[in-house]
Regions:
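N-terminal "mature-domain start" segment
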Residues: 16-68, 114-136
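A short, solvent-exposed beta-edge/loop patch
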Residues: 62-136
Length: 136
C-alpha cells in the first residue's frame, strides 16, 4: 500500500465511531420570548422515564423552563419518523401534560401553573423549530 492509500484509509476510519453532533437544540435557552431554560441535562438513554423504546432512541434531553409558570420538558430524538408516529398514536394523555411529534423528535411537556397562551406559544415555537430542522 502506498502512503497515500494509508492516509486515505486512516482518514476514513477516523470519522467512524464519533458521537453525532447536535444538529439542532430541541430545548433552546429562550422560547417564545417569556420562557427561560433554568436547567438542562443530556440524559443517558437508559434513564428515559417514558414508554419510549430505548432501541428507538438516539438522544434524550431534559430541561426545566420558568416563565409564566413552570415547564418540565423532555425531548427524545428518535431513530425514525415511524417511531414518532407510533408514539403519538399510543401515548396516554395525562393531566397538565402535552406531547407532540415533530420530525425525528418526540416532545413531552409537563407544566405547573402555566398561562395557557404562553404554553401554546412555547409549544408552537418548539414544534416549528423541530419541523424546519434538516433531516438526519
Amino acid at each position: 500500500m502506498t502512503r497515500r492509500s494509508w492516509f486515505l484509509l486512516t482518514s476514513a476510519l477516523a470519522g467512524c465511531g464519533s458521537k453525532p453532533e447536535r444538529s439542532i437544540d430541541p430545548l433552546p435557552e429562550n422560547v417564545a420570548g417569556v420562557w427561560r431554560r433554568k436547567e438542562w441535562h443530556d440524559m443517558p438513554l437508559s434513564e428515559a422515564p417514558d414508554p419510549v423504546p430505548q432501541s428507538s432512541l438516539r438522544r434524550f434531553e431534559s430541561a426545566l423552563y420558568q416563565g409564566p409558570g413552570v415547564i418540565q420538558a423532555r425531548a427524545y430524538q428518535l431513530t425514525s419518523k415511524a417511531v414518532g408516529l407510533e408514539l403519538a398514536q399510543r401515548w396516554r394523555p395525562s393531566a397538565d401534560t402535552v406531547f407532540f411529534w415533530a420530525g425525528d423528535w418526540f416532545i413531552v411537556l409537563k407544566w405547573q401553573d402555566a398561562d395557557r397562551t404562553a404554553l401554546q406559544a412555547f409549544t408552537r415555537e418548539v414544534e416549528a423549530r423541530l419541523n424546519t430542522a434538516p433531516a438526519r
